[in-house]
Amino acid sequence: ERLRAVQDRRAAMFRILESTGTIELRSLVEGGESFDSCAMDLWRQGDEFALRLRKFGERFLWIGSDGRDWWVFELTGEPTRLVVMPLDRGLPTDLPLEESLLGPRKLLEIAGLMPFGDRLRVDGPELAEDGLLRLETRGSGEGGWHRLRWTIEPRRMLPVAVEALDDQGRCVVRSSLREYEPIAARDQPVGDWPQFPGKVLIRDATGETDVRIYFNRPNARGGRIKPALFDLERLIETFKPERVEHRLDRVPSTPP
């Protein structure tokens, strides 16, 4: 229960989050390897999320969510494209894996920034031979992420790795979380600032896709966060995508 309380409190402070940094995207493609190094800006406010990537100063990719839907603006292709999807549905198969790994829920899960809450499995953490704790939680289900296996450093109670598992218990994606430092958080004194991983390394099980995130001066205060970052209509006016794909078939729900 103490481990749950520590992670849940830490994750709650990250519901407001902003950072600059660098993202490196590597993937094997026919005939060789694709590599992109991008400047990053990330903003999160509750369930709202925005991630901007720039390459050589030009817009490259914008991923965002208003808490109900999420979207990807692909800004360098011909034609430029916007894909809009509901958060409660699986991922389209034509979306590149490196883009789907940067989606709001997946990124927060694999970076160890989500609470355990009631998702923690009842068999609880196990102490492995390497002295680290292992535990499992339910995953979002997106893209086959049915469970998450966490590796926790017990002294500081911080996740150092997260694995996304499919419905057969096979690892789909694995992350390594490194270089923790305390970051400023809203309404928290310096001594209570939460620990945040400065480096998140993500690799899929095939080894064909690799995403490396290097955060620069992250904070949980939210001083630069503005509503327009999460407003899809305003983003469309700004980016003017040449092709728009709405994939909004939703899980049926009972009307209020």
Predicted regions and their residues:
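A short, surface-exposed beta-strand/turn
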Residues: 44, 65, 146-164, 214-226
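An acidic-aromatic
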Residues: 44-106
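Edge/loop elements at the starts and ends of beta-strands within beta-rich repeat scaffolds
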Residues: 9-17, 32-35, 42-47, 63-65, ...
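Non-transmembrane domains of secretory- and envelope-associated proteins
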Residues: 129-131, 166-256
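A mature extracytoplasmic/lumenal domain signature
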Residues: 23, 53-57, 67, 76-77, ...
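Extended beta-strand-rich segments in extracellular/periplasmic secretory proteins, especially
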Residues: 108-199
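Beta-strand-dominated lipid-handling architectures at cellular/organellar boundaries
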Residues: 20-22, 33-39, 43-48, 158-161, ...
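N-terminal leader/targeting segments and the immediate start of mature chains
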Residues: 1-39, 95-98, 126, 244-256
